[in-house]
A protein has these predicted regions:
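Radical SAM enzyme [4Fe-4S]-AdoMet core and its adjacent flexible, acidic
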Residues: 70-235, 239-241
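Conserved alpha-helical substructure of the radical SAM core
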Residues: 1-75, 161, 170-171
C-alpha cells in the first residue's frame, strides 16, 4: 500500500541509484504517487525506468511532472526494444507495439531537448531468439533514433524458457563491439557517461562469467544492492529473488 511504501521510504535513507521496474511500470495506477515518495524521501541522484512505450501520454505526463518538480534528479527512460517493426511485435506478442515505441520516443524527445537531466536509452536482450538479428536491430536504432545510449542485456537468471539462453560468445562480442563504437560519438550528458562506463564494465564481466565461467569480483548483493518486489518482499538481487 502507499502507506507502507511511505513508511519504508522514510527509513531507507539517501540513494545514489533507484530503478523502478516491472513488468511495465506505467501500468500501475499509483505509479506517480509511489515514485514521488521515493523521490521526496530517498533523494536519489539517478533514476532508471524501463518501459515498453505502450502508454505514450502517461509516460510523457509522468516525466514532464517530475522533471520540473525534481530538477536535481537525473532521469533515464529506457525503451525495451527486441526487434524492428513486425519482428518486435512478434517477439513481444503484441501487434503495434513497435509503433507505440516510436510514438512514445518522439514525444519524449521533445522533453529531452528541454531538460538536461533526462536521457533516452534503448535496451535489447541478447537471447537465442535474437542473436542472429540483434546487430541489424541496433544499427537501425542508431540510424533512425537519437538514443543517448544503446545497451544490450545478456539473458540470465530465472528465465522461464531456458532455450532462450545462449552461449554464442562470438556474436555477443561482435554486437557489443558495435555498441562500444557508436557510444564514442554520442553527446555526454552526465547520466549518459556514467551508464556508458557501467555498460563497458558489464560487457567485460558478462564475457568472463557467462561465457568463460570465471570469477570476476565478490558479490555485493544485499550490501550495495537490494530489490523490493511489488508485494514488499526484499531480496539481495534479481537472481536470488
Amino acid at each position: 500500500t502507499l502507506d507502507e511504501i511511505k513508511k519504508m521510504t522514510e527509513k531507507i535513507g539517501p540513494l545514489v541509484q533507484l530503478s523502478l521496474t516491472g513488468g511495465e511500470p506505467f501500468l500501475r495506477n499509483e505509479f506517480t504517487e509511489i515514485s514521488d515518495l521515493f523521490y521526496k524521501n530517498c533523494k536519489p541522484l539517478y533514476v532508471t525506468i524501463p518501459t515498453n512505450g505502450s502508454l505514450t501520454d502517461r509516460i510523457f505526463d509522468y516525466y514532464k511532472f517530475f522533471l520540473e518538480k525534481y530538477p536535481k534528479i537525473n532521469f533515464r527512460c529506457v525503451f525495451s526494444i527486441e526487434g524492428i517493426g513486425a519482428e518486435h511485435d512478434k517477439l513481444r506478442d503484441v501487434k503495434g507495439s513497435f509503433k507505440k515505441i516510436e510514438d512514445s520516443y518522439n514525444k519524449m524527445y521533445s522533453l529531452r531537448k528541454k531538460y538536461k537531466n533526462l536521457v533516452l536509452d534503448s535496451n535489447s536482450v541478447f537471447t537465442a531468439n535474437s542473436e542472429d538479428t540483434l546487430l541489424g536491430t541496433l544499427k537501425y536504432l542508431e540510424k533512425n533514433f537519437n538514443f543517448d545510449n544503446i545497451s544490450v542485456t545478456y539473458a540470465r537468471g530465472n528465465i522461464p524458457d531456458e532455450n532462450l539462453k545462449t552461449l554464442a560468445k562470438k556474436k555477443y562480442i561482435e554486437i557489443n563491439d558495435y555498441v562500444d563504437s557508436i557510444e564514442r560519438n554520442k553527446e555526454g550528458r552526465i547520466f549518459s557517461n556514467i551508464m556508458r562506463g557501467i555498460n563497458s564494465i558489464t560487457r567485460e564481466n558478462v564475457i568472463k562469467v557467462g561465457f568463460e565461467d570465471k570469477f570476476v569480483n565478490p558479490c555485493v548483493a544485499g550490501k550495495k544492492i537490494v530489490v523490493i518486489s511489488e508485494t514488499g518482499d526484499v531480496f539481495p538481487c534479481e537472481i536470488l529473488g
